[in-house]
Structures are given as C-alpha cells and as structure tokens.
UniProtKB/Swiss-Prot annotation:
Leader sequence residues: none
Molecular function via GO: proton-transporting ATP synthase activity, rotational mechanism
Keyword Thylakoid assigned: yes
Protein name: ATP synthase subunit b'
C-alpha cells in the first residue's frame, strides 16, 4: 500500500523547507507586526492612564477651587447682607430720631401756640369782662 521510496523523505524535506520559509517570510514579520502593535497598544494604554490620572487630578483641583469660590461668594453675600441690614437699621434709627425730633418740635410749637392762644383769650376775656361790667354796672360804679 505505501511505498517507501525517495518520495517520503523528499516530502518530509519539502515540509521542513516550507516550514522554514513560512517562518522566515510570513510568521516572523507577522509576529514582529503583532509585537509592535501590542507595544503600541500598551504605550497608548499607559499614556491614556496617565492622562486620565492627570484629568482626575485637575478635575479634583477645579472642584476644590469651585467649592472654595462658592464658600467665598457665600461669605461675601452674607457680609453684604449683614452690611445692608446694618445700614438699613441705621437709616431706620436715624429716621425714627428725626421723626421723634420733628414730633417734639411740633409738640413744642403746638404748646407755644396753645399758650399764646390762652394768653390772648385771657386778655380778651378780661377785656370782655370789663365791657360786660361797664354795660351792666355802668361806668360810675366800676372805679
């Protein structure tokens, strides 16, 4: 069935030569390309990790700055509100003092006018009383 003549060793030799040729022409360049690609992927992955770490650090730093800025702005707002309340209280107190002063001035003027009116009424009452006495009693009896 099988002949063991020179074809079998020749085929074996062809197989070995073909294996060496395929290895030299196809497998080594392909392995080189695959290794270069793996190195390229590994390098890019490391760069991406570094960039991601830097981005996270920068993001964290910016978030901290935003938090600090918010705190500062809230403090500024609180200070401004306190200052506004203080100024409003001062203005209200000043207005109340001015109102009280005007009220006292008006009360003094009213009292002065009242006293003046009472004084003039007393004089008029005295004059009218004298006139009534003159009319009732006559000018001779009054002296």
């Amino acid at each position: 069935m099988f002949d063991f003549d020179a074809t079998l060793p020749l085929m074996a030799l062809q197989f070995v030569v073909l294996a060496f040729l395929l290895n030299a022409i196809f497998y080594k360049p392909m392995n080189k390309v695959l290794d270069e690609r793996a190195d390229y992927i590994r390098t890019n992955e490391e760069d991406a990790r570094e960039r991601l770490a830097k981005a996270k650090a920068i993001t964290q730093e910016y978030e901290q700055q935003i938090t600090d800025a918010r705190r500062q702005s809230q403090a500024v707002i609180a200070d401004a509100q306190a200052e506004a309340r203080r100024l409003a209280a001062e203005k209200i107190a000043e207005a109340q003092r001015e109102s009280q002063r005007q009220k006292e001035t008006a009360a003094q003027e009213i009292e002065a006018q009242r006293q003046s009116a009472l004084s003039s009424l007393e004089q008029e009452v005295a004059a009218l009383s004298n006139q009534i006495l003159h009319k009732l009693l006559g000018p001779e009896l009054i002296k």
